[in-house]
UniProtKB/Swiss-Prot annotation:
Native organism: Equus caballus (Horse)
Gene symbol of the encoding locus: MT-CO3
Mitochondrial intermembrane domain ranges by topology: 35-40, 106-128, 184-190, 257-261
Subunit organization: Component of the cytochrome c oxidase (complex IV, CIV), a multisubunit enzyme composed of 14 subunits. The complex is composed of a catalytic core of 3 subunits MT-CO1, MT-CO2 and MT-CO3, encoded in the mitochondrial DNA, and 11 supernumerary subunits COX4I, COX5A, COX5B, COX6A, COX6B, COX6C, COX7A, COX7B, COX7C, COX8 and NDUFA4, which are encoded in the nuclear genome.
Major location category of this protein: mitochondrion
Name of protein: Cytochrome c oxidase subunit 3
Catalytic EC class: translocase
Membrane topology type: Multi-pass membrane protein
Length: 261
């Protein structure tokens, strides 16, 4: 490593942004091929390229931060700002779905029967699986906070236990959501109700899967003693993201499942 007189991380040339862009092209093109020609070859290639890119890019970042010492306090401060801006962008992303839902539900058109839910739609009971899902995510918020406090106190065993419980609850939530989709009496093609319901809850479910993956990586890293009480931004970012997913679900539950039904 060349000598430098500043605390900033000058990133070395990397192929992963290019392969990541290629995987995005393959996945979007693959989705179009799947929808129109029932061919999943391009989509599978895109997913494989994306998984390989994620693994190798994360490997490089872990090497730079944990073993090479590139992530100084100034670099970590910049990463924190970046994560905050990313979460803010996600807030606006989900705001669009809530806007679409309330635009359609507060003033139902004659085509919908002048009522909400639209005529012929039988919404899910908010006091059954959706309420259980809410309890699961709230419990996962408690366990991730426990894991964070345990890490700050240097209690590795409790940190791993809290993280494992959070991951298990995240997987359980995903399975419950999948069963709910399977048993729903309406589909994404059933007008504006079906489209707003499945797009909003579906993207939230995708974020739960992403967050669970994020936490699994943190769990595997902690098994290798990568985190300390003073150097653990990877885990902190995962915890922020998970709390954001929790809050979005509360808004989804109150708006779409409870009020919208």
């Amino acid at each position: 490593m060349t000598h430098q007189t500043h605390a900033y991380h000058m990133v070395n040339p990397s192929p992963w942004p290019l392969t990541g862009a290629l995987s995005a092209l393959l996945m979007t093109s693959g989705l179009a091929m799947w929808f129109h020609f029932n061919s999943t070859l391009l989509l599978a290639m895109g997913l494989l390229t994306n998984i390989l890119t994620m693994y190798q890019w994360w490997r490089d970042i872990i090497r730079e931060s944990t073993f090479q010492g590139h992530h100084t306090s100034i670099v970590q401060k910049g990463l924190r700002y970046g994560m905050i801006l990313f979460i803010i962008s996600e807030v606006f992303f989900f705001s669009g779905f809530f806007w679409a839902f309330y635009h359609s539900s507060l003033a139902p058109t004659p085509e919908l029967g002048g009522c909400w839910p639209p005529t012929g739609i039988h919404p899910l009971n908010p006091l059954e699986v959706p309420l259980l899902n809410t309890s699961v995510l709230l419990a996962s918020g408690v366990s991730i906070t426990w894991a964070h406090h345990s890490l700050m106190e240097g209690n590795r065993k409790n940190m791993l236990q809290g993280l494992f419980i959070t991951i298990s609850l995240g997987v359980y939530f995903t399975l419950l959501q999948a069963s709910e989709y399977y048993e729903a009496s309406f589909t994404i093609s059933d007008g504006v109700y079906g489209s707003t319901f499945f797009v909003a809850t579906g993207f939230h479910g995708l974020h739960v899967i992403i967050g669970s993956t994020f936490l699994i990586v943190c769990f595997l890293r902690q098994l290798k003693f990568h985190f300390t009480s003073s150097h653990h931004f990877g885990f902190e970012a995962a915890a922020w993201y998970w709390h954001f997913v929790d809050v979005v679900w509360l808004f989804l539950y109150v708006s779409i499942y409870w009020w919208g039904s």
